[in-house]
UniProtKB/Swiss-Prot annotation:
Knot repeats: 37-84, 104-141, 151-197, 216-263, 292-338
Compartmental location: Cell membrane
Gene Ontology terms for molecular function: coreceptor activity; endopeptidase inhibitor activity; metalloendopeptidase inhibitor activity; serine-type endopeptidase inhibitor activity; Wnt-protein binding
Organism per entry: Mus musculus
Protein name: Reversion-inducing cysteine-rich protein with Kazal motifs
Gene: Reck
Role this protein plays: Functions together with ADGRA2 to enable brain endothelial cells to selectively respond to Wnt7 signals (WNT7A or WNT7B). Plays a key role in Wnt7-specific responses: required for central nervous system (CNS) angiogenesis and blood-brain barrier regulation. Acts as a Wnt7-specific coactivator of canonical Wnt signaling by decoding Wnt ligands: acts by interacting specifically with the disordered linker region of Wnt7, thereby conferring ligand selectivity for Wnt7. ADGRA2 is then required to deliver RECK-bound Wnt7 to frizzled by assembling a higher-order RECK-ADGRA2-Fzd-LRP5-LRP6 complex.
Length: 971
């Protein structure tokens, strides 16, 4: 579908027409309030037009829409017109959710300024509270966002063009030449207005004074080059002119090892001479998208993708070829879905749309682009389609008058293409083929269809899928959501993103210290995965990125440093993704998943990785069925726990041996009963502190110590990391606790319902002293009392295994529960059973910390990808050597909507693991997760529910650590 190519004024009029407002040219009565206000914009025709439309509008909804868009055409600097409209239209200038300055508010230094910014709808609203000379960063960010909103709106629904445009305005540094070149290459044919707008911005951007780098000229080895360098820096202004002049004057190309060019590289990021900031490593222009290139099915698209996202932007021809050959090719759905994950990840929830209103109030559905800009794009598309033609990249589809032929269905199509609802499993965003065929048969102008084309053939190309797990049924969006205020039961603190462009939004799961008010999210510093990337990772984390040249299967691991750049990169051995597996005489390519009996398997670089579940088949004899226990190696159902070297308690020695452990690698008794500090292996200057952990890496290579040595300090200056002692007293950190001579009970704030020690059995088969102790280990609780049974592993397992266990009641809302493997009691949750590559984990540990990688590390990383604070992540290593991840509601009485949200989060993460999406795979050690199976607990009607929640939903409050949740007492 083509975008509008018109002047800025005609584009504005099209916007107003699409809003349903007739154009009024000088139609306001002379002397009226509207005429007086609009006369303040007589030198800005675009602003005058929108002003007249505002005062002519009779519809509240249209007025609201126009007011939201007005700042794009009437800059905040036009104080007179804004003051006039404020006084002439009292009550209508309320906070706009779409204000471009909202994402800048965290940059405010003053608290009052920050609060005013978050309540504002325009820059005028903060001018009295926020002083420009003091809040430079805030006002710079707002001005940049205002300019970006105007420029990038010309991209229409062209995702790539809009993305490259937004990258120009995303940071407070001067746009790089490659960024500007990318916009020119990809947007020139789409919107000349956009190019002109961006050029105006980049040319006006305050550049660093070239004379600040004069000292670099002395590093040139050639005297003539030294003189040429000084002359060029004194006379040239732009970066391009300087680079071209130096190449010509010094007769040398820019080489990083050349002292002259090395100095320029350093000084470009350093404010003062001699203060060196090393240039970022070569991670490609966009490491996240480069990861997607290996998913291309054709060599042509793989090469084009690699060329575009590796070390230098492709030329215009490369972009056009990628657009023509790959961007809409159904064969390349894996690569395209991966790229979409990077550009616009699927996120739960959609609200505050003014045109696509049927998409609002859907807190448990996933969308890629629920934004005011996409909402506007859908309205613009509808206006274009009303002209009788839908322009697609390879075909123009003639249609009848869509204002009278199925208008609501066409609106659903336009909104779906822009808002992009996506499946939790496939993450696909295309509409279903049957809907496509139906609407084209009814409303397509079939007499004008291109030769040899029918509704079916057109839809076969545009929407080839009709599987409800791969396509979006339009029927869902032909009516408003059935949910009203109930949507408040599920919140999305980071959607839309409230943080500045260079920071990462994280859900606040720690609560507020001392019951002080605080935000439900936090903004943390991050790094981009390349110059042109908008994929941000947390500062201090390890990241896996493809090699900068884009060789398939070659990766490096980097750390996100304090500078905001990826640094300390370490190459990993390349993986041969061309290697296949032979299974049952059939060849399985890398990444293929399949089942063998009841086990799930995946081929990973020629290695077959399978779960180790014991299976019964239709051919099993009666004797086999009678003796079948469901346990590994068909071990007897006997609970005589042993503690293995990896820190995991196994139900019996038989099961420990079955998972590959030798007799000398485990000892009888649960791990929790062992004292790792006896004997004390720490030096006298350090204190031995128990630190139980379950390790996933090879013990012989990296060990798995169950303690840590902490320095004995006279003063404790560590950051706040609350812990609770055995007397139920809280301390700010471990250092303070031990300094006061206390013993650790559990990590985290003290909780009232853990005052009395009451043992509980965790899903991992470990007995904990309290619920809080289990939760500090990120283990959810199965039942009260010490562990006494092996638990259920399969549908064939005997129910007698858990006969002596008394399970707590399910939640009041009710659900169709699940039973985690090895547990006895059902619960309402989403569950993932994940296979991992142990060799990959060993490699990661070897090239990074040389320390073992633990289950808790995996869970903490996965936790960052759960966006709903009403759900939290727990898990353990099963006795079948799978990582079991549970996404469980945390509220007192979880509602059906909250259970559904946890289910959707689980399905989303399963899809990201199975598709090797960079959304997850970029994060070390999640890149070692190979394949996942999901199981969710669907909600039941309230009439089917009996009992009150006595355990699971209440105890999970600990995951938040919020004082508001401390109301519960045991019955």
């Amino acid at each position: 579908m083509a975008s509008v190519r018109a002047s800025p004024r005609s584009a504005l009029l099209l916007l107003l027409a699409a809003a349903g407002v007739a154009e009024v040219t000088g139609g306001l009565a002379p002397g009226s309030a509207g005429a007086v206000c609009c006369n303040h914009s007589k030198d800005n025709q675009m602003c005058r037009d929108v002003c007249e439309q505002i005062f002519s509008s009779k519809s509240e909804s249209r007025l609201k829409h126009l007011l939201q868009r007005a700042p794009d055409y009437c800059p905040e600097t036009m104080v007179e017109i804004w003051s006039c409209m404020n006084s002439s239209l009292p009550g209508v200038f309320k906070k706009s959710d779409g204000w471009v300055g909202l994402g800048c508010c965290e940059l405010a230094i003053g608290l009052e300024c920050r609060q005013a910014c978050k309540q504002a709808s325009s820059k005028n609203d903060i001018s009295k509270v926020c002083r420009k000379e003091y809040e430079n960063a805030l006002f710079s960010c707002i001005s940049r966002n205002e300019m970006g909103s105007v420029c990038c709106s010309y991209a229409g629904h062209h995702t790539n063009c809009r993305e490259f445009c937004q990258a120009i305005f995303r940071t407070d540094s001067s746009p790089g030449p490659s960024q500007i070149k990318a916009v020119e290459n990809y947007c020139a044919s789409i919107s000349p207005q956009l190019i002109h707008c961006v050029n105006n911005y980049t040319q006006s951007y305050p550049m660093r004074n070239p004379t600040d780098s004069l000292y670099c000229c002395d590093r040139a080895e050639d005297h003539a080059c030294q003189n040429a360098c000084k002359r060029i820096l004194m006379s040239k202004k732009t970066e391009m002119e300087i680079v071209d002049g130096l190449i010509e004057g010094c007769k040398t190309q820019p080489l990083p090892q050349d002292p002259l060019w090395q100095c320029f590289l350093e000084s470009s990021q350093s404010v003062h001479p001699g203060v060196t900031v090393h240039p970022p490593p070569s991670t490609g222009l966009d490491g996240a998208k480069l990861h997607c290139c290996s998913k291309a099915n054709t060599s042509t698209c793989r090469e084009l993708c690699t060329k575009l996202y590796s070390m230098s932007w492709g030329n215009t021809q490369s972009w056009q070829e990628f657009d023509r050959i790959c961007e809409y090719n159904p064969v390349e759905v894996s690569m395209l879905t991966c790229l979409a994950d990077v550009r616009e990840p699927c996120q739960l929830g959609c609200t505050n749309l003014t045109y696509c209103t049927n998409f609002n109030n859907r807190p448990t559905e996933l969308f890629r682009s629920c934004t005011a800009q996409s909402d506007q794009g859908a309205m613009s598309d509808m206006k274009l389609w009303e002209k009788g033609s839908i322009k697609m990249p390879f075909i123009s589809i003639p249609v009848l008058d869509i204002k009278t032929c199925q208008p609501e269905m066409w609106k659903a199509v336009a909104c779906s293409l822009q808002i992009k609802p996506c499946h939790s499993k496939s993450r696909g965003s295309i509409i279903c083929k049957s809907d496509c065929v139906e609407i084209l048969k009814k409303c397509g102008d079939q007499n004008k269809f291109p030769e040899e084309h029918t509704a079916e053939s057109i839809c076969e190309f545009l929407s080839p899928a009709d599987d409800l797990e791969s396509c979006i049924p339009l029927d869902t969006y032909l009516r408003p959501s059935a949910l009203g205020n109930i949507i408040e039961e599920v919140t999305h603190p980071c959607n839309p993103n409230p943080c500045p462009a260079n920071e990462l939004c994280e859900v606040n799961r720690k609560g507020c210290p001392s019951a002080d008010p605080c935000l439900p999210y936090s903004c943390v510093q991050g790094c981009k995965l390349g110059e042109a990337s908008d994929f941000i990772v947390r500062q201090g984390t390890l990241i896996q990125v493809p090699s900068s040249a884009g060789e398939v299967g070659c990766y490096k691991i980097c750390s996100c440093g304090q500078s905001g750049l990826l640094e300390n990169c370490m190459e990993m051995h390349c993986i041969d993704l061309q290697k296949s597996c032979i299974v049952g005489g059939k060849r399985k390519s890398h990444g293929t998943s399949f089942t063998i009996d009841c086990n799930v398997c995946s081929c990973f670089a020629g290695n077959l990785v399978c779960s180790t579940r014991l299976c019964l088949s239709e051919h099993s004899s009666d004797d086999d069925r009678r003796t079948f226990t469901g346990l590994p190696c068909n071990c007897a159902d006997q609970f005589v726990p042993v503690c293995a070297q990896n820190g995991r308690t196994y139900p019996s020695a038989c099961i420990a041996r079955c998972v590959g452990l030798q007799d000398h690698q485990f000892e009888f008794g649960p791990c929790i009963s062992k004292n790792p500090c006896n004997p004390n292996l720490c030096p006298k200057s350090q204190r031995c502190v128990p630190k139980p952990q379950v390790c996933l890496t090879t013990f012989d290579k990296f060990g798995c110590s169950q303690y840590e040595c902490v320095p004995r300090q006279l003063t404790c200056d560590q950051a706040r990391d609350p812990v609770c002692d055995t007397d139920h007293m809280e301390h700010s950190n471990l250092c303070t606790l031990y300094q006061r001579g206390k013993s650790l009970s559990y990590r985290g704030p003290c909780q009232p319902f853990c005052r009395a020690k009451e043992p509980v059995c965790g899903h991992n088969g470990e007995t904990y002293s309290s619920v809080c102790a289990a939760y500090s280990d990120r283990v959810a609780v199965d039942y009260y009392g010490p562990c006494q049974a092996v638990g259920v592993l399969s549908e064939y397992s005997a129910v007698a295994e858990c006969a002596a266990v008394k399970c707590p009641s399910l939640s009041a809302i009710g659900c169709k529960p699940i039973i985690p493997p090895g547990a006895c009691c059902p619960l309402c949750a989403g569950m993932l059973r994940v296979l991992f590559d142990k060799e990959k984990l060993d490699t990661i540990a070897k090239v990074t910390s040389k320390k073992p990688i633990t289950v808790v590390e995996i869970l903490q990383k996965v936790r960052m990808h759960v966006s709903v604070p009403q759900c939290d992540v727990f898990g353990y290593l099963s006795i079948e050597s799978e990582i079991v991840i549970l996404i469980i509601p945390v509220d007192h009485y979880p509602k059906a909507l909250q259970i559904e949200a946890c289910n959707k989060e689980a399905e989303k993460i399963e899809s990201l693991i199975n598709s090797d999406s960079p959304t997850l795979a970029s994060h070390v050690p999640l890149s070692a997760l190979i394949i996942s199976q999901v199981q969710v607990s669907s909600s039941l009607p309230s009439s089917a529910v009996v009992g009150r929640p006595l355990f699971h939903s209440l105890l999970l409050l600990l995951s938040l650590g919020l004082t508001v949740h401390l109301l519960w007492t045991r019955p």
